[in-house]
Amino acid sequence: MRSEKHLLPLPLLLAICCLGTLHLSSGFPQSVPSYLEGLDIPESERHAFCFSQWTALQDQEQIPSFVMDLCSSIYNRMKVNEENNHEIYKRFLFQFSRAKDPSLKIGESQIATAEYTKRDSSGIVGRPFFLFRPRNGRKVSINEH
């Protein structure tokens, strides 16, 4: 006869893993979750603290080795993601912290302000002209008002 091996289905195995990661009353300090809730600590640092607590409990037989491997792999991935985010943030700051040339130089802006008011044929300064044409396409005449 063929020896029958009972393989656990994936959902049951996942449920066992989740139950294995619950805070156990023996060995895990119960005051840590309430201590962390009062502080303004980023989520990644909370996970890192919890993972460091789990790794401190390696000697206990209650925590299976696959749970420890899972915690270690998640912690390592988080560390890599944080390093990548830090590099992206540094590049972003470097790009926008460089001094940029002003779009209008001082001489050009003085010329632009001198030409802002429109003079009519008699040389009298009239009202300022519109920079854009009206939407209906009509031209603006000074004599309308």
Swiss-Prot record:
The entry sums up its family as follows: Belongs to the NmU family.
Mention any one GO cellular component term assigned to this protein in its UniProt record: extracellular region
The organism's lineage is: Eukaryota, Metazoa, Chordata, Craniata, Vertebrata
Q: Which organism is it from?
A: Bombina maxima
Q: Does the keyword Signal apply?
A: yes
Keywords for the protein's UniProt record, in alphabetical order: Amidation, Cleavage on pair of basic residues, Secreted, Signal
Full protein name: Neuromedin-S
InterPro entries per the record?
Answer: Neuromedin-U_amidation-site (IPR018070), NmS (IPR043253)
Any extra remark in the record?
Isoform 3 encodes peptide NmS-33, at positions 92 to 124, as a result of splicing out of an exon that encodes a processing site which generates NmS-17. Similar 33-mers and 36-mers have been isolated from human and from mouse and rat, respectively, although they do not arise by alternative splicing.
- Asparagine amide: residues carrying this PTM: N136
**Propeptide section residues:** 28-89, 92-117, 140-145
Tissue spec = Expressed by the skin glands.
Name of the gene encoding the protein in the UniProt record: nms
Q: Where in the cell is it found?
A: Secreted
Principal localisation: secreted
Tell me the first and last residues of the signal peptide: 1-27
